[in-house]
């Protein structure tokens, strides 16, 4: 399942991933969304 990532608001790695996701979305959809901040983040643990 999914679990919360503690300290996500202060994580440079998570912020960089979010900025990348917004940039990629804007390229594919010809949109002009702007990244503002990370509110929360979750991770998924997959076994196997």
Swiss-Prot record:
The keyword NADP does not apply. A motif (Secondary area of contact) lies at residues 44-48. The keyword Translocase does not apply. It comes from the Eukaryota. GO terms for molecular function: cysteine-type endopeptidase inhibitor activity. InterPro entries: Cystatin (IPR027214), Cystatin_dom (IPR000010), Cystatin_sf (IPR046350). Pfam families: Cystatin. Keywords: Protease inhibitor, Thiol protease inhibitor. SUPFAM superfamilies: Cystatin/monellin. Belongs to the cystatin family. Phytocystatin subfamily. Inhibits papain and cathepsin B (very poorly). PANTHER family: CYSTATIN FAMILY MEMBER (PTHR11413), CYSTEINE PROTEINASE INHIBITOR (PTHR11413:SF125). This is Cystatin. It comes from Glycine max (Soybean). The lineage of its organism: Eukaryota, Viridiplantae, Streptophyta, Embryophyta, Tracheophyta.
